[in-house]
């Protein structure tokens, strides 16, 4: 709801969409001047002085929802999609092609993807996550032109998450890329999430050398347009991140190929802000965000250990 203030300026309660049982990315009760907020988001998305600040990738409909036990109505998901589109982001993950027995919330991802194609926003890249080569084939069959794949730097995590070892995942991703290359459908973007950067929820901390080794392996695939460093546990420190970034850049990986997926809680924003500043200093502009305060890997983590996704407001606050 919004109201008018003196002088005709509109104030907006930035919890501009009600989702039962959930908070949006903007803290409950928080109010901002709508014009100031809109201007700030425009600068984030479009840049300042010709220099882009962040290229936001919205994961609200996939990572933001996947841990919810009660399936959300399609109408609510459609409303969420329009809410996301209104934020001027150009990359939106619609859902995941996965067995509904594993993630019931993703059961209608295909229907939501089909709906997205009727909206008429040709400048938006709609993504679907495909956890293995079988679902990559399905994604291509339904016309998905932007696909997300997943791996990690932890063998135990990968076994629990998708029932494949890291080595078997490598084989399957190679198969997925081959399927995409031989497809009649032109795939515009291929994103690869590399989970457990810094820490695995099962075995604990992962050495930076192991993390870098796995990233460099996948960087050899020219078909992978976006290598996303995913801080699954929400414990990545700025020092470790800086160390990883410097090695990757020295190895010749372009900043434009890298992106970041953070998990956090509202009590540790200094850490998050420092990491985002490192991103900006090295030219890494793509960052995953969600406008609902949820997210995380429910397959491998208990509810009390899951930290939420980075939000739009977190990005906004980091630039103040």
Locate each region found by the language model:
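Active-site mouth loops of central-metabolism enzymes
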Residues: 59-76, 125-132, 159-162, 196-209, ...
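Catalytic alpha/beta core domains of metabolic enzymes, predominantly
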Residues: 232-319
């Amino acid at each position: 709801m919004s109201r008018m203030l003196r002088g005709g300026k509109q104030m907006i309660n930035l919890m501009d969409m009600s989702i039962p049982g959930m908070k949006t990315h903007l803290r409950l009760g928080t109010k901002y001047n709508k014009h100031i907020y809109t201007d700030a988001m425009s600068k984030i998305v479009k840049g300042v002085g010709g220099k882009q600040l962040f290229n936001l990738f919205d994961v609200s409909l996939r990572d933001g929802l996947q841990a919810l036990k009660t399936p959300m109505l399609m109408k609510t998901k459609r409303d969420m999609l329009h809410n996301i589109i209104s934020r001027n982001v150009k990359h939106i993950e619609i859902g995941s092609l996965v067995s509904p027995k594993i993630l019931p919330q993703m059961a209608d991802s295909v229907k939501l993807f089909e709906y997205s194609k009727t909206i008429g926003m040709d400048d938006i890249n709609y993504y679907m996550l495909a956890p293995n080569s079988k679902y990559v084939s399905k994604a291509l069959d339904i016309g998905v032109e932007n696909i997300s794949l997943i791996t990690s730097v932890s063998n135990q995590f990968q076994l629990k998450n998708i029932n494949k070892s890291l080595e078997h995942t490598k084989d399957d991703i190679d198969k997925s890329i081959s399927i995409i290359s031989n497809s009649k459908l032109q795939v515009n973007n291929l994103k690869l999430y590399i989970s457990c950067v810094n820490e695995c929820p099962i075995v604990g901390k992962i050495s930076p050398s192991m993390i870098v080794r796995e990233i460099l392996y996948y960087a050899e695939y020219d078909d992978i347009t976006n290598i996303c460093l995913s801080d699954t546990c929400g414990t990545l420190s700025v020092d470790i991140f800086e160390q990883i970034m410097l090695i990757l850049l020295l190895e010749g990986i372009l900043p434009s190929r890298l992106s970041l997926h953070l998990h956090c809680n509202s009590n540790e924003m200094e850490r998050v802000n420092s990491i985002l500043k490192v991103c900006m200093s090295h030219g890494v502009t793509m960052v995953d965000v969600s406008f609902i305060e949820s997210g995380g890997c429910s397959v491998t983590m208990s509810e009390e250990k899951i930290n939420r996704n980075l939000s739009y407001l977190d990005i906004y606050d980091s630039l103040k």
